[in-house]
């Protein structure tokens, strides 16, 4: 009677180890083949934690994923941006350790897109430095909260991302009095020595006139994923003083609503923050 030969235990162990390695390798490359969800990317990164430690290699992997599935990869990048601001509440209560790993040292909320700071509102691009300083001196940002983040994406030539922030500020009457005429207020508008201001800020990102999102926007040298947009910022006052400032003939055309071309957003930090 013929007996089947059994593999030695050592050979079985080696076979299982080889099989496990192959499975891990497949898992690591799965998201490059057909990236369709943020959870899929998280699973791939969990299988290979070194990916997020080498940003250049990570950008290269995402570039490969984009080549295989442009729309799916772009949606994942936008979902990560939304998750970071709306779900993880990076502007309200960021995780300091994750923030440094994702955005780098020396960065702050002013480097998050969008935000309600002077930099985030592009005040330096709207006004002369002296005017921007007036606004900065009048209104001191105290709190900002992401209230909505909506994504409509069909293709790189048809998309709309809209983010609504509520910003709370404060003022000191002694500081504001020097600028009453410039900002459209009079002495009777400020009935208290100090007070709060509130506004809704709506950031709308749409298709840019040039530099549509493509493979070349995955910058492996600078370790960035540059998503170019046209940006429109609208401000809506929520209290009487803020409404009057926005209705001022001096500022109404530039402060309440303005559009900016070629506004590039590096999506890599949001992706890292959402999966770390």
Swiss-Prot record:
Which residue stretches, if any, does this entry annotate as coiled coil? none
Q: State the UniProt keywords alphabetically.
A: Cell membrane, Lipoprotein, Membrane, Palmitate, Signal
What is the recorded membrane topology of this protein? Lipid-anchor
Which PROSITE patterns does the record match to this protein?
A: PROKAR_LIPOPROTEIN
- Cite a GO CC annotation: plasma membrane
Question: What does the UniProt entry say about where the protein is found?
Answer: Cell membrane
Tell me which residues bear the S-diacylglycerol cysteine lipid modification: 26
The record places the lipid (N-palmitoyl cysteine) at 26
The leader peptide range reads 1-25
Instruction: List the InterPro entries.
Output: Lipoprotein_3
Q: Does the keyword Magnesium apply?
A: no
Assigned protein family: Belongs to the MG439/MG440 family.
Name under which the protein is recorded: Uncharacterized lipoprotein MG440 homolog 3
